[in-house]
């Protein structure tokens, strides 16, 4: 049972990292809550 919990935490961690890093050709665009083409987040400007 402990092995199952460790695997679950590992998989959830991978999903969190995959969601935090958008797979887009331009790393300057950060996708937040949906399909955003030109969302540049730099110092709130």
Curated annotation (Swiss-Prot):
Disulfide bonds join 36-39. GO terms for biological process: antifungal humoral response; defense response; innate immune response; response to bacterium; response to mycotoxin. One of its GO terms (cellular component) is extracellular region. Residues 1-20 form the signal peptide. Induction: By bacterial infection. Keywords: Amidation, Disulfide bond, Immunity, Innate immunity, Secreted, Signal. The modification Glycine amide is found at residue 43. Hemolymph (at protein level). Residues 21-27 form a propeptide. Pfam families: DIM (PF08194). It is found in: Secreted. InterPro entries: Bomanin. It comes from the Eukaryota. Secreted immune-induced peptide induced by Toll signaling. Has a role in resistance to bacterial and fungal infections. Has no activity against the fungus C.glabrata in vitro. Belongs to the bomanin family. This is Bomanin Short 1. It comes from Drosophila melanogaster. The gene is BomS1.
């Amino acid at each position: 049972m402990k092995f199952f919990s460790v695997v679950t935490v590992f998989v959830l961690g991978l999903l969190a990292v995959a969601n935090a890093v958008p797979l887009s050709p331009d790393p300057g665009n950060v996708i937040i809550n949906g399909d955003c083409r030109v969302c540049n987040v730099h110092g709130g400007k």
